[in-house]
Amino acid sequence: MANAVGRRSWAALRLCAAVILLDLAVCKGFVEDLNESFKDNRKDDIWLVDFYAPWCGHCKKLEPIWNEVGLEMKSIGSPVKVGKMDATSYSSIASEFGVRGYPTIKLLKGDLAYNYRGPRTKDDIIEFAHRVSGALIRPLPSQQMFDHVRKRHRVFFVYIGGESPLKEKYIDAASELIVYTYFFSASEDVVPEYVTLKEMPAVLVFKDDTYFVYDEYEDGDLSSWISRERFQNYLTMDGFLLYELGDTGKLVAIAVIDEKNTSLEHTRLKSIIQEVARDFRDHFHRDFQFGHMDGNDYINTLLMDELTVPTIVVLNTSNQQYFLLDRHIKDASDMVQFINSILDGTVPAQGGDSIFQRLKRIVFDAKSTIVSIFKSSPLMGCFLFGLPLGVISIMCYGIYTADTDGGYIEERYEVSKSEMENQEQIEESKEQESSSGGSLAPTVQEPKDVLEKKKD
Protein backbone atom coordinates (compact mmCIF):
# COMPACT_ATOMS: atom_id res chain seq x y z
CA MET A 1 0.00 0.00 0.00
CA ALA A 2 2.75 2.39 0.98
CA ASN A 3 4.66 1.57 -2.19
CA ALA A 4 1.59 2.29 -4.29
CA VAL A 5 1.08 5.68 -2.60
CA GLY A 6 4.76 6.49 -3.10
CA ARG A 7 4.57 5.59 -6.79
CA ARG A 8 1.49 7.79 -7.26
CA SER A 9 3.19 10.71 -5.47
CA TRP A 10 6.29 10.31 -7.61
CA ALA A 11 4.15 10.18 -10.75
CA ALA A 12 2.32 13.35 -9.68
CA LEU A 13 5.64 15.14 -9.10
CA ARG A 14 6.90 14.09 -12.51
CA LEU A 15 3.66 15.30 -14.10
CA CYS A 16 3.96 18.70 -12.38
CA ALA A 17 7.58 18.99 -13.49
CA ALA A 18 6.61 18.11 -17.05
CA VAL A 19 3.84 20.73 -17.04
CA ILE A 20 6.23 23.39 -15.73
CA LEU A 21 8.84 22.54 -18.34
CA LEU A 22 6.17 22.57 -21.04
CA ASP A 23 4.97 26.01 -19.91
CA LEU A 24 8.53 27.33 -19.98
CA ALA A 25 9.07 25.89 -23.44
CA VAL A 26 5.81 27.40 -24.70
CA CYS A 27 6.66 30.82 -23.23
CA LYS A 28 10.15 30.78 -24.69
CA GLY A 29 8.70 29.77 -28.05
CA PHE A 30 7.09 33.21 -28.42
CA VAL A 31 10.35 35.08 -27.76
CA GLU A 32 12.71 34.98 -30.72
CA ASP A 33 16.48 34.77 -30.29
CA LEU A 34 17.84 37.46 -32.59
CA ASN A 35 21.15 37.47 -34.46
CA GLU A 36 23.04 39.65 -36.97
CA SER A 37 20.32 39.19 -39.62
CA PHE A 38 17.91 41.15 -37.42
CA LYS A 39 19.45 44.45 -38.53
CA ASP A 40 18.34 43.97 -42.15
CA ASN A 41 15.05 42.13 -41.59
CA ARG A 42 13.42 44.16 -38.82
CA LYS A 43 12.13 47.27 -40.62
CA ASP A 44 8.92 45.70 -41.91
CA ASP A 45 7.77 44.84 -38.37
CA ILE A 46 7.46 46.39 -34.92
CA TRP A 47 9.80 44.75 -32.43
CA LEU A 48 10.00 44.76 -28.65
CA VAL A 49 13.56 43.67 -27.87
CA ASP A 50 15.39 42.84 -24.66
CA PHE A 51 19.13 43.50 -25.03
CA TYR A 52 20.81 41.39 -22.36
CA ALA A 53 24.16 40.05 -21.20
CA PRO A 54 24.52 36.38 -20.14
CA TRP A 55 26.38 37.31 -16.94
CA CYS A 56 23.91 40.04 -15.88
CA GLY A 57 21.90 39.21 -12.74
CA HIS A 58 19.11 41.69 -13.54
CA CYS A 59 18.81 40.15 -17.00
CA LYS A 60 18.28 36.71 -15.47
CA LYS A 61 15.53 38.11 -13.22
CA LEU A 62 13.84 39.66 -16.24
CA GLU A 63 13.94 36.47 -18.34
CA PRO A 64 10.80 34.73 -16.96
CA ILE A 65 8.88 38.03 -17.09
CA TRP A 66 10.02 38.53 -20.67
CA ASN A 67 8.80 35.06 -21.62
CA GLU A 68 5.39 35.93 -20.15
CA VAL A 69 5.36 39.15 -22.17
CA GLY A 70 6.00 37.16 -25.35
CA LEU A 71 3.21 34.71 -24.56
CA GLU A 72 0.72 37.47 -23.71
CA MET A 73 1.48 39.52 -26.82
CA LYS A 74 1.02 36.44 -29.00
CA SER A 75 -2.22 35.38 -27.32
CA ILE A 76 -3.89 38.79 -27.80
CA GLY A 77 -2.82 38.98 -31.44
CA SER A 78 -0.57 42.00 -31.03
CA PRO A 79 1.35 43.10 -34.15
CA VAL A 80 4.40 43.65 -31.94
CA LYS A 81 6.97 40.87 -32.12
CA VAL A 82 8.95 40.04 -29.00
CA GLY A 83 12.63 39.12 -29.16
CA LYS A 84 15.87 39.15 -27.22
CA MET A 85 19.47 39.69 -28.26
CA ASP A 86 22.77 38.92 -26.57
CA ALA A 87 24.29 42.40 -26.66
CA THR A 88 27.75 41.05 -25.85
CA SER A 89 27.78 38.74 -28.87
CA TYR A 90 26.28 41.32 -31.24
CA SER A 91 27.83 44.43 -29.75
CA SER A 92 27.86 46.39 -33.02
CA ILE A 93 24.08 46.07 -33.41
CA ALA A 94 23.55 46.93 -29.73
CA SER A 95 25.72 50.03 -30.09
CA GLU A 96 23.79 51.10 -33.17
CA PHE A 97 20.58 51.07 -31.11
CA GLY A 98 22.22 53.00 -28.28
CA VAL A 99 22.42 50.20 -25.72
CA ARG A 100 24.51 51.38 -22.76
CA GLY A 101 23.53 48.97 -19.99
CA TYR A 102 21.85 45.64 -19.33
CA PRO A 103 19.06 44.83 -19.58
CA THR A 104 17.83 47.46 -22.05
CA ILE A 105 14.29 47.23 -23.41
CA LYS A 106 13.55 49.01 -26.67
CA LEU A 107 10.60 49.16 -29.01
CA LEU A 108 11.83 49.43 -32.61
CA LYS A 109 9.38 50.99 -35.04
CA GLY A 110 10.78 51.80 -38.47
CA ASP A 111 13.76 54.07 -37.99
CA LEU A 112 12.71 54.99 -34.44
CA ALA A 113 13.88 53.31 -31.23
CA TYR A 114 11.99 53.97 -27.98
CA ASN A 115 13.56 53.22 -24.61
CA TYR A 116 11.47 51.63 -21.88
CA ARG A 117 12.24 53.11 -18.44
CA GLY A 118 9.29 51.85 -16.42
CA PRO A 119 8.93 49.07 -13.84
CA ARG A 120 9.98 45.66 -15.12
CA THR A 121 6.61 43.99 -14.74
CA LYS A 122 4.63 42.16 -17.39
CA ASP A 123 1.65 44.54 -17.36
CA ASP A 124 3.76 47.71 -17.50
CA ILE A 125 5.91 46.41 -20.36
CA ILE A 126 2.86 45.31 -22.36
CA GLU A 127 1.14 48.67 -21.84
CA PHE A 128 4.31 50.41 -23.05
CA ALA A 129 4.34 48.25 -26.18
CA HIS A 130 0.68 48.99 -26.96
CA ARG A 131 1.10 52.73 -26.36
CA VAL A 132 4.24 53.22 -28.46
CA SER A 133 3.35 50.82 -31.27
CA GLY A 134 0.06 52.58 -31.98
CA ALA A 135 -0.66 56.01 -33.42
CA LEU A 136 1.27 58.92 -31.95
CA ILE A 137 -1.89 61.04 -31.61
CA ARG A 138 -5.07 58.96 -31.25
CA PRO A 139 -8.34 60.58 -32.33
CA LEU A 140 -11.42 60.67 -30.08
CA PRO A 141 -14.36 60.79 -32.52
CA SER A 142 -17.16 60.68 -29.94
CA GLN A 143 -17.97 61.42 -26.32
CA GLN A 144 -18.50 57.70 -25.72
CA MET A 145 -14.94 57.05 -26.84
CA PHE A 146 -13.77 59.88 -24.58
CA ASP A 147 -15.56 58.30 -21.60
CA HIS A 148 -14.00 54.93 -22.43
CA VAL A 149 -10.50 56.45 -22.48
CA ARG A 150 -11.24 58.30 -19.25
CA LYS A 151 -12.09 55.06 -17.46
CA ARG A 152 -9.11 53.18 -18.88
CA HIS A 153 -6.28 55.69 -18.32
CA ARG A 154 -5.42 57.48 -15.11
CA VAL A 155 -3.54 60.27 -16.91
CA PHE A 156 -3.85 61.34 -20.55
CA PHE A 157 -3.49 64.49 -22.66
CA VAL A 158 -5.91 65.87 -25.23
CA TYR A 159 -5.45 68.49 -27.93
CA ILE A 160 -8.69 70.28 -28.80
CA GLY A 161 -8.94 72.29 -31.98
CA GLY A 162 -7.81 72.35 -35.58
CA GLU A 163 -4.48 72.94 -37.26
CA SER A 164 -2.32 75.47 -35.43
CA PRO A 165 1.25 76.12 -34.22
CA LEU A 166 0.15 74.71 -30.85
CA LYS A 167 -0.75 71.42 -32.52
CA GLU A 168 2.70 71.22 -34.09
CA LYS A 169 4.25 71.69 -30.65
CA TYR A 170 1.87 69.06 -29.30
CA ILE A 171 2.97 66.55 -31.95
CA ASP A 172 6.64 67.26 -31.22
CA ALA A 173 6.07 66.76 -27.49
CA ALA A 174 4.15 63.53 -28.11
CA SER A 175 6.94 62.08 -30.26
CA GLU A 176 9.31 62.59 -27.34
CA LEU A 177 7.05 61.64 -24.43
CA ILE A 178 4.91 58.84 -25.90
CA VAL A 179 7.05 56.41 -23.89
CA TYR A 180 5.44 57.80 -20.72
CA THR A 181 1.81 58.65 -21.42
CA TYR A 182 -1.05 58.74 -23.96
CA PHE A 183 -1.86 61.58 -26.37
CA PHE A 184 -5.25 62.17 -27.99
CA SER A 185 -6.96 64.77 -30.15
CA ALA A 186 -10.63 65.75 -30.24
CA SER A 187 -13.05 68.40 -31.37
CA GLU A 188 -14.73 70.74 -28.92
CA ASP A 189 -18.10 68.96 -29.07
CA VAL A 190 -16.53 65.67 -27.89
CA VAL A 191 -15.29 67.14 -24.61
CA PRO A 192 -17.65 66.76 -21.61
CA GLU A 193 -19.84 69.73 -20.69
CA TYR A 194 -18.06 70.33 -17.38
CA VAL A 195 -14.88 71.29 -19.28
CA THR A 196 -14.73 75.04 -19.85
CA LEU A 197 -12.20 76.52 -22.26
CA LYS A 198 -11.35 80.21 -22.42
CA GLU A 199 -9.75 79.95 -25.84
CA MET A 200 -9.12 77.54 -28.67
CA PRO A 201 -7.05 75.58 -29.52
CA ALA A 202 -6.08 74.12 -26.14
CA VAL A 203 -4.15 71.28 -24.54
CA LEU A 204 -5.63 69.59 -21.46
CA VAL A 205 -4.49 66.92 -19.05
CA PHE A 206 -7.12 64.73 -17.41
CA LYS A 207 -6.19 63.15 -14.08
CA ASP A 208 -7.33 62.83 -10.47
CA ASP A 209 -11.01 63.18 -11.49
CA THR A 210 -10.40 66.67 -12.83
CA TYR A 211 -8.53 68.46 -15.62
CA PHE A 212 -5.93 71.20 -16.09
CA VAL A 213 -5.50 73.50 -19.08
CA TYR A 214 -2.09 74.38 -20.45
CA ASP A 215 -1.29 78.09 -20.20
CA GLU A 216 1.76 79.04 -22.22
CA TYR A 217 2.28 82.27 -20.23
CA GLU A 218 2.24 80.56 -16.81
CA ASP A 219 3.44 77.05 -17.68
CA GLY A 220 6.20 77.81 -20.18
CA ASP A 221 7.34 75.17 -22.65
CA LEU A 222 4.68 72.61 -23.59
CA SER A 223 7.00 69.59 -23.35
CA SER A 224 8.16 70.65 -19.88
CA TRP A 225 4.56 71.11 -18.77
CA ILE A 226 3.61 67.64 -20.01
CA SER A 227 6.63 66.16 -18.19
CA ARG A 228 5.45 67.78 -14.96
CA GLU A 229 1.80 66.84 -15.34
CA ARG A 230 2.14 63.21 -16.47
CA PHE A 231 1.92 61.97 -12.86
CA GLN A 232 -1.10 61.77 -10.60
CA ASN A 233 -1.08 64.28 -7.78
CA TYR A 234 -0.76 61.59 -5.07
CA LEU A 235 1.40 58.50 -5.57
CA THR A 236 2.74 55.50 -3.72
CA MET A 237 6.43 56.29 -3.94
CA ASP A 238 9.38 54.03 -4.64
CA GLY A 239 12.93 54.54 -5.85
CA PHE A 240 11.95 54.36 -9.51
CA LEU A 241 9.22 56.99 -9.19
CA LEU A 242 11.49 59.38 -7.29
CA TYR A 243 14.05 59.04 -10.07
CA GLU A 244 11.38 59.82 -12.69
CA LEU A 245 10.11 62.79 -10.69
CA GLY A 246 13.55 64.35 -10.93
CA ASP A 247 12.67 65.48 -14.47
CA THR A 248 9.58 67.39 -13.34
CA GLY A 249 11.35 70.05 -11.28
CA LYS A 250 8.72 69.62 -8.56
CA LEU A 251 9.30 69.23 -4.84
CA VAL A 252 8.06 65.90 -3.47
CA ALA A 253 6.30 65.81 -0.09
CA ILE A 254 6.41 62.26 1.29
CA ALA A 255 4.92 60.65 4.38
CA VAL A 256 7.49 58.00 5.33
CA ILE A 257 5.52 55.31 7.15
CA ASP A 258 5.39 51.61 7.90
CA GLU A 259 2.33 50.29 6.08
CA LYS A 260 2.24 47.23 8.32
CA ASN A 261 1.97 49.48 11.36
CA THR A 262 -1.66 50.49 11.90
CA SER A 263 -0.98 52.86 14.78
CA LEU A 264 -2.60 56.30 14.79
CA GLU A 265 0.56 58.30 14.01
CA HIS A 266 1.34 56.35 10.83
CA THR A 267 -2.18 56.63 9.42
CA ARG A 268 -2.50 60.27 10.56
CA LEU A 269 0.55 61.52 8.64
CA LYS A 270 -0.52 59.65 5.51
CA SER A 271 -4.02 61.14 5.75
CA ILE A 272 -2.59 64.66 6.17
CA ILE A 273 -0.54 64.36 2.97
CA GLN A 274 -3.57 62.97 1.10
CA GLU A 275 -5.77 65.81 2.37
CA VAL A 276 -3.30 68.50 1.30
CA ALA A 277 -2.88 66.89 -2.13
CA ARG A 278 -6.65 66.77 -2.61
CA ASP A 279 -7.88 70.02 -1.04
CA PHE A 280 -4.99 72.32 -1.97
CA ARG A 281 -4.46 71.01 -5.48
CA ASP A 282 -4.94 74.41 -7.12
CA HIS A 283 -2.37 76.00 -4.80
CA PHE A 284 0.43 73.46 -4.98
CA HIS A 285 0.06 71.15 -7.98
CA ARG A 286 2.42 73.27 -10.12
CA ASP A 287 5.24 73.04 -7.58
CA PHE A 288 4.59 69.93 -5.47
CA GLN A 289 4.09 66.21 -5.84
CA PHE A 290 2.58 64.28 -2.93
CA GLY A 291 2.73 60.68 -1.81
CA HIS A 292 3.80 58.16 0.81
CA MET A 293 6.58 55.59 1.00
CA ASP A 294 6.66 52.31 2.87
CA GLY A 295 9.80 52.17 5.02
CA ASN A 296 12.79 54.47 5.24
CA ASP A 297 15.54 52.37 3.62
CA TYR A 298 15.59 54.21 0.30
CA ILE A 299 15.12 57.63 1.91
CA ASN A 300 18.01 56.96 4.30
CA THR A 301 20.23 56.16 1.34
CA LEU A 302 19.11 59.28 -0.49
CA LEU A 303 19.56 61.58 2.51
CA MET A 304 22.62 59.79 3.95
CA ASP A 305 20.87 59.98 7.31
CA GLU A 306 18.66 57.85 9.54
CA LEU A 307 15.07 59.09 9.53
CA THR A 308 12.66 58.08 12.23
CA VAL A 309 9.42 56.48 11.08
CA PRO A 310 6.79 57.89 10.75
CA THR A 311 7.84 61.32 9.51
CA ILE A 312 7.37 63.75 6.65
CA VAL A 313 10.18 64.85 4.37
CA VAL A 314 10.16 67.14 1.34
CA LEU A 315 12.65 66.26 -1.42
CA ASN A 316 14.02 68.31 -4.27
CA THR A 317 15.00 65.44 -6.55
CA SER A 318 16.61 67.72 -9.12
CA ASN A 319 19.45 68.86 -6.81
CA GLN A 320 19.24 66.31 -3.94
CA GLN A 321 18.21 68.90 -1.35
CA TYR A 322 15.66 68.04 1.31
CA PHE A 323 13.60 69.71 4.03
CA LEU A 324 12.78 68.18 7.40
CA LEU A 325 9.94 69.18 9.69
CA ASP A 326 10.64 72.22 11.85
CA ARG A 327 7.38 71.84 13.76
CA HIS A 328 4.92 69.22 14.95
CA ILE A 329 2.32 68.54 12.28
CA LYS A 330 -1.10 68.29 13.90
CA ASP A 331 -3.32 68.68 10.85
CA ALA A 332 -3.40 69.73 7.20
CA SER A 333 -3.15 73.45 8.06
CA ASP A 334 0.21 72.83 9.77
CA MET A 335 1.42 70.99 6.68
CA VAL A 336 0.30 73.90 4.48
CA GLN A 337 2.26 76.31 6.68
CA PHE A 338 5.32 74.08 6.39
CA ILE A 339 5.02 74.01 2.59
CA ASN A 340 4.62 77.79 2.43
CA SER A 341 7.70 78.16 4.64
CA ILE A 342 9.66 76.08 2.14
CA LEU A 343 8.42 78.18 -0.77
CA ASP A 344 9.31 81.50 0.89
CA GLY A 345 12.74 80.21 1.98
CA THR A 346 12.31 80.38 5.77
CA VAL A 347 12.98 76.64 6.16
CA PRO A 348 16.66 75.93 5.39
CA ALA A 349 17.44 73.26 2.82
CA GLN A 350 19.78 70.42 3.73
CA GLY A 351 21.89 68.19 1.51
CA GLY A 352 22.49 69.27 -2.07
CA ASP A 353 25.05 68.41 -4.74
CA SER A 354 28.03 70.49 -3.59
CA ILE A 355 31.58 69.10 -3.70
CA PHE A 356 31.43 68.33 0.02
CA GLN A 357 28.14 66.46 -0.42
CA ARG A 358 29.58 64.50 -3.35
CA LEU A 359 32.58 63.44 -1.28
CA LYS A 360 30.23 62.54 1.55
CA ARG A 361 28.18 60.49 -0.93
CA ILE A 362 31.27 58.56 -2.04
CA VAL A 363 32.18 57.72 1.56
CA PHE A 364 28.57 56.83 2.41
CA ASP A 365 28.14 54.56 -0.62
CA ALA A 366 31.43 52.79 0.12
CA LYS A 367 30.44 52.28 3.75
CA SER A 368 26.96 51.06 2.80
CA THR A 369 28.39 48.60 0.28
CA ILE A 370 30.84 47.15 2.79
CA VAL A 371 28.17 46.84 5.50
CA SER A 372 25.70 45.18 3.12
CA ILE A 373 28.32 42.67 1.98
CA PHE A 374 29.21 41.69 5.54
CA LYS A 375 25.53 41.46 6.51
CA SER A 376 24.60 39.26 3.57
CA SER A 377 27.74 37.09 3.55
CA PRO A 378 30.34 37.57 6.31
CA LEU A 379 32.72 34.98 4.84
CA MET A 380 32.57 36.59 1.43
CA GLY A 381 33.22 39.98 3.03
CA CYS A 382 36.26 38.66 4.87
CA PHE A 383 37.60 37.18 1.66
CA LEU A 384 36.94 40.26 -0.49
CA PHE A 385 38.48 42.72 1.94
CA GLY A 386 40.85 40.51 3.94
CA LEU A 387 42.77 39.19 0.95
CA PRO A 388 43.61 42.61 -0.55
CA LEU A 389 44.53 43.99 2.87
CA GLY A 390 46.82 41.01 3.45
CA VAL A 391 48.53 41.48 0.09
CA ILE A 392 48.96 45.21 0.71
CA SER A 393 50.39 44.53 4.18
CA ILE A 394 52.94 42.08 2.78
CA MET A 395 53.93 44.57 0.09
CA CYS A 396 54.35 47.37 2.64
CA TYR A 397 56.45 45.12 4.89
CA GLY A 398 58.60 44.12 1.93
CA ILE A 399 59.13 47.74 0.92
CA TYR A 400 60.02 48.73 4.50
CA THR A 401 62.49 45.91 4.99
CA ALA A 402 64.01 46.54 1.57
CA ASP A 403 64.65 50.16 2.53
CA THR A 404 66.24 49.10 5.83
CA ASP A 405 68.55 46.56 4.20
CA GLY A 406 69.50 49.08 1.56
CA GLY A 407 70.44 51.62 4.20
CA TYR A 408 72.52 49.04 6.04
CA ILE A 409 74.37 48.03 2.86
CA GLU A 410 74.94 51.66 1.98
CA GLU A 411 76.29 52.31 5.46
CA ARG A 412 78.63 49.31 5.27
CA TYR A 413 79.75 50.50 1.86
CA GLU A 414 80.63 53.91 3.30
CA VAL A 415 82.54 52.28 6.19
CA SER A 416 84.47 50.00 3.84
CA LYS A 417 85.29 52.92 1.61
CA SER A 418 86.66 54.96 4.52
CA GLU A 419 88.70 51.98 5.75
CA MET A 420 90.22 51.55 2.30
CA GLU A 421 91.10 55.23 2.15
CA ASN A 422 92.77 55.02 5.56
CA GLN A 423 94.69 51.93 4.49
CA GLU A 424 95.85 53.66 1.33
CA GLN A 425 97.01 56.67 3.34
CA ILE A 426 99.01 54.41 5.69
CA GLU A 427 100.63 52.60 2.78
CA GLU A 428 101.47 55.89 1.09
CA SER A 429 103.08 57.21 4.27
CA LYS A 430 105.15 54.04 4.60
CA GLU A 431 106.31 54.30 1.01
CA GLN A 432 107.29 57.91 1.56
CA GLU A 433 109.29 56.98 4.66
CA SER A 434 111.09 54.14 2.91
CA SER A 435 111.93 56.29 -0.09
CA SER A 436 113.23 59.12 2.08
CA GLY A 437 115.47 56.66 4.08
CA GLY A 438 117.11 55.25 0.89
CA SER A 439 118.07 58.64 -0.46
CA LEU A 440 119.92 59.72 2.76
CA ALA A 441 122.12 56.53 3.19
CA PRO A 442 125.02 57.48 0.79
CA THR A 443 125.66 60.88 2.40
CA VAL A 444 125.96 59.65 5.96
CA GLN A 445 129.43 58.24 6.87
CA GLU A 446 129.68 55.43 9.35
CA PRO A 447 132.38 55.80 12.13
CA LYS A 448 135.74 54.17 11.39
CA ASP A 449 137.13 51.43 13.62
CA VAL A 450 140.74 51.37 15.20
CA LEU A 451 142.49 49.45 12.36
CA GLU A 452 141.19 51.81 9.72
CA LYS A 453 142.46 54.72 11.79
CA LYS A 454 145.97 53.15 12.04
CA LYS A 455 146.11 52.61 8.28
CA ASP A 456 145.29 56.22 7.82
Curated annotation (Swiss-Prot):
Disulphide-bonded residues: C56-C59
Keyword terms, alphabetized: Disulfide bond, Endoplasmic reticulum, Glycoprotein, Isomerase, Membrane, Redox-active center, Signal, Transmembrane, Transmembrane helix
MF GO annotations: protein disulfide isomerase activity; protein-disulfide reductase activity
Carbohydrate attachment residues: N35, N261, N316
Domain Thioredoxin: 30-131
Lumenal side: 30-378
Domain of life: Eukaryota
Protein EC: 5.3.4.1
Species the sequence originates in: Mus musculus (Mouse)
Biological role stated in the UniProt entry: Probable disulfide isomerase, which participates in the folding of proteins containing disulfide bonds. May act as a dithiol oxidase. Acts as a regulator of endoplasmic reticulum-mitochondria contact sites via its ability to regulate redox signals.
Gene: Tmx3
InterPro entries, per database record: PDI_TMX3 (IPR052250), Thioredoxin-like_sf (IPR036249), Thioredoxin_CS (IPR017937), Thioredoxin_domain (IPR013766)
Region (Disordered): 416-456
Subcellular location: Endoplasmic reticulum membrane
Catalytic residues as annotated in Swiss-Prot or TrEMBL: C56 (nucleophile), C59 (nucleophile)
Composition bias, Basic and acidic residues: 446-456
Species classification: Eukaryota, Metazoa, Chordata, Craniata, Vertebrata
Secretion signal, residue range per the UniProt entry: 1-29
A single cellular component GO annotation: endoplasmic reticulum membrane
Membrane topology: Single-pass membrane protein
Catalytic activity: Catalyzes the rearrangement of -S-S- bonds in proteins
Transmembrane segments: 379-399
Domain notes per entry: The di-lysine motif confers endoplasmic reticulum localization for type I membrane proteins.
Name of the molecule in the record: Protein disulfide-isomerase TMX3
Entry's family note: Belongs to the protein disulfide isomerase family.
Motif (Di-lysine motif): 453-456
PANTHER family in the cross-refs: PROTEIN DISULFIDE-ISOMERASE TMX3
Pfam families xref list: Thioredoxin (PF00085), Thioredoxin_6 (PF13848)
Residue spans, topological domain Cytoplasmic: 400-456
